Curated annotation (Swiss-Prot):
Its EC number is 2.1.1.182. One of its GO terms (cellular component) is cytoplasm. It is found in: Cytoplasm. It catalyses: adenosine(1518)/adenosine(1519) in 16S rRNA + 4 S-adenosyl-L-methionine = N(6)-dimethyladenosine(1518)/N(6)-dimethyladenosine(1519) in 16S rRNA + 4 S-adenosyl-L-homocysteine + 4 H(+). InterPro entries: KsgA/Erm (IPR001737), RPE2 (IPR022436), rRNA_Ade_diMease-like_C (IPR023165), rRNA_Ade_Mease_Trfase_CS (IPR020596), rRNA_Ade_methylase_Trfase_N (IPR020598), rRNA_adenine_dimethylase (IPR011530), SAM-dependent_MTases_sf (IPR029063). It holds the Pfam family RrnaAD. GO terms for molecular function: 16S rRNA (adenine(1518)-N(6)/adenine(1519)-N(6))-dimethyltransferase activity; RNA binding. It comes from the Bacteria. This is Ribosomal RNA small subunit methyltransferase A. S-adenosyl-L-methionine binds at residues 23, 25, 50, 72, 97, 149. NCBIfam families: ksgA, RPE2. The gene is rsmA. Specifically dimethylates two adjacent adenosines (A1518 and A1519) in the loop of a conserved hairpin near the 3'-end of 16S rRNA in the 30S particle. May play a critical role in biogenesis of 30S subunits.
Amino acid sequence: MLPSIAKHAALHQVNPLRKHGQNFIFDSSLCDKIVRASNLAENSRVLEIGPGTGGLTRSILQKNPESLTVIETDERCLPLLNEIKEYYPNLNIIKQDALKINLTDLSCDIVNSVGFAYKKREAKPITNRRANDIGESKLIDYKVTIISNLPYHIGTELVIRWLKEARLITSMTLMLQKEVVERICAIPSTKAYGRLSVICQLIAKVEKCFDVAPTAFYPPPKVYSAIVKLIPLENPLSIALINKVEQITKLAFAGRRKMIKSSLKNLVPNIHEVLTQLNINDNYRAENLAPQDYLRIAEIL
């Protein structure tokens, strides 16, 4: 039987390190609550970033997924995670920086095991009957469920990256800084509304689940956290269109208080005609335009 999360960490002398952005969760009931919020279906393929001391990992595994792949960069946590694997053979552990992994680099090895095997770029391709050839790369035709307590310093970057691979994702249930979650879920004409709101809401249905107090962590961070769930919409946007929306929103929200006709004039010299054609008031500011307005501008350019 596994020891408690906190005792397991103590046995392996795993203390949180600032350089890894680590704030550990030792409360198993909170971990269970996060997994419940994900509505994780049995036999799902799950991905977790930064499992650390394995609290959330345990709660996911107790839901009997087909496989759980964890990406951990801290070598100190690997022996601890391998001990959990002794009880749950469907746990796959990859030591890697999460920012260096794309979902398309995670391939299901259906010959030797159920779950994921990481395809290093220099390695021979994994034979996979469940993938479709696209040039030299593989497009996975199954989807993963992502459940993670993300390090604050890379959380937003990972969310944007994953949204660009939304076709591979069933849902994402993520712990992030509360301020970031509020930005993801913000509606137009509010203070929190911005680029992140637009991009997330054009690609996924977003829902804030609940707040998490600093006291839930060791050591306690200086800010509140929150759980957000993102479910990719059907018919995801193309990468080209997402990139265009990113370009437009970067200009628009850089001058947040400027009228949109001024913010975008360097991108589109005839911006007044474009906005008129789309029936968008060119006296609006960036925060007044809905996500769909930005998409319509991107589509017409």
